[in-house]
């Protein structure tokens, strides 16, 4: 069963600067916890159209491919096929100008194959989202 989780953070940078970091998927292994490899399989006009990621975290590893839909105010993605750990995944970053930078909302819907009690699964998803937003904020603000 797929669960949806979301969280929002404000980053002290323009939406364009935030989107530039999100678009640079091949750099994710440098600053994103758990991602060891990111390969652009298919480039796109506004950003990578298809990317294969290799992840390893908490004793679990997986390789998965996402297709992206880039917009001026964010990006959405979807898992191309089930993997060892995931049945499905959709997500998005929505960027909105804010008084003190950019408000970034991360939405993630995942259906995982690893059996987990509902409350534990939701807690894990919330942890993934919060960690991703904190890492994104740190990366963007370090490049200013």
List where the protein language model places each region.
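Hydrophobic pocket/interface hotspot
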Residues: 18-22, 28, 51, 77, ...
């Amino acid at each position: 069963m797929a669960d949806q989780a979301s969280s929002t953070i404000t980053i002290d940078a323009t939406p364009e600067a935030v989107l530039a970091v999100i678009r640079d998927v091949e750099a994710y292994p440098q600053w994103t916890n758990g991602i060891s490899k990111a390969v652009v399989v298919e480039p796109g006009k506004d950003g990578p159209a298809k990317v294969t990621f290799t992840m390893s975290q908490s004793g679990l590893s997986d390789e998965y491919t996402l297709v992206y839909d880039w917009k001026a105010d964010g990006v959405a993605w979807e898992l191309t096929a089930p993997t060892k750990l995931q049945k499905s995944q959709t997500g998005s970053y929505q960027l909105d100008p804010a008084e003190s930078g950019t408000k970034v909302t991360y939405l993630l819907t995942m259906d995982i194959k690893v059996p987990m009690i509902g409350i534990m699964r939701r807690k894990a998803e919330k942890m993934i989202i919060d960690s991703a937003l904190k890492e994104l904020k740190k990366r963007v603000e370090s490049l200013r």
